[in-house]
Amino acid sequence: MLPRLGGPALPLLLPSLLLLLLLGAGGCGPGVRAEVLFRCPPCTPERLAACGPPPDAPCAELVREPGCGCCSVCARQEGEACGVYIPRCAQTLRCYPNPGSELPLKALVTGAGTCEKRRVGATPQQVADSEDDHSEGGLVENHVDGTMNMLGGSSAGRKPPKSGMKELAVFREKVNEQHRQMGKGAKHLSLEEPKKLRPPPARTPCQQELDQVLERISTMRLPDDRGPLEHLYSLHIPNCDKHGLYNLKQCKMSLNGQRGECWCVNPNTGKPIQGAPTIRGDPECHLFYNEQQENDGAHAQRVQ
């Protein structure tokens, strides 16, 4: 689904599959910049009351928390670290991966980006977009650039579509990319037998489930002006590894600034591992999977 992020579990799917929707996305290069606007739930009086006092340290600018948080935090200034899960850059800045980074998306996810002035090539419409970001409206835009190009994003000069359609298009492309990555193995034919076509390998259960999700996304419509996010949150996108098996850890999408719940599954069947917790964090699935394997082995020996 995604370019390689590092580690066998990350090449295809991040725990927050709606990464580009939850943090926004931009082109990484002069003249290319596309951003995703998405609608956050309104900040209720109860949520605002739970925020407590504003930061004690003097801030050049206050911004909302990452994601759809309602509380105020100090904006990151030029040269400071930035990323998906840490405070936003100030209004005139963008969060970029460091030049030459081999894993730019991973850098943004892990907070290893840097707040910089907007790079050359932004159009007047894009400047207007950045001004709207700090208004009191219901739209929130996180400026974290460097991911859209890797997912085949829009090119410079293309008229941006409506925000809801843009969200859905990015999401579809993200799942399509996972689909293509998992099918790469079947496309590399032997150089010695260029005319001999090999039958495609059988789809694994995880790949089949992904196919079904992709089909549902392709038929989604926008019935109103609320945008597609509420519909996307109801989907579970399977986290498949490069071999098409389920990754041990599966996670729901992040919502309202909170990490989604994660649980452990059998890599072959995708069924939950008994005894493993469901938590907002790392359930350390390898421990429960190893224990299950040992129990299954002991049971097999008793049967023999």
Swiss-Prot record:
Keyword Secreted: yes
Domain of life: Eukaryota
Keyword Metal-binding among UniProt keywords: no
Name recorded for this polypeptide: Insulin-like growth factor-binding protein 2
Alphabetical UniProt keywords: Developmental protein, Disulfide bond, Glycoprotein, Growth factor binding, Growth regulation, Secreted, Signal
Notes concerning its domains: The C-terminus is required for IGF-binding and growth inhibition.
Disulfide bridge partners, by residue number: C40-C68, C43-C70, C51-C71, C59-C74, C82-C95, C89-C115, C206-C240, C251-C262, C264-C285
All residue ranges annotated as the Thyroglobulin type-1 domain in the record: 203-285
Job description of the protein: Multifunctional protein that plays a critical role in regulating the availability of IGFs such as IGF1 and IGF2 to their receptors and thereby regulates IGF-mediated cellular processes including proliferation, differentiation, and apoptosis in a cell-type specific manner. Functions coordinately with receptor protein tyrosine phosphatase beta/PTPRB and the IGF1 receptor to regulate IGF1-mediated signaling by stimulating the phosphorylation of PTEN leading to its inactivation and AKT1 activation.
Signal peptide segment: 1-34
A GO MF label: insulin-like growth factor binding
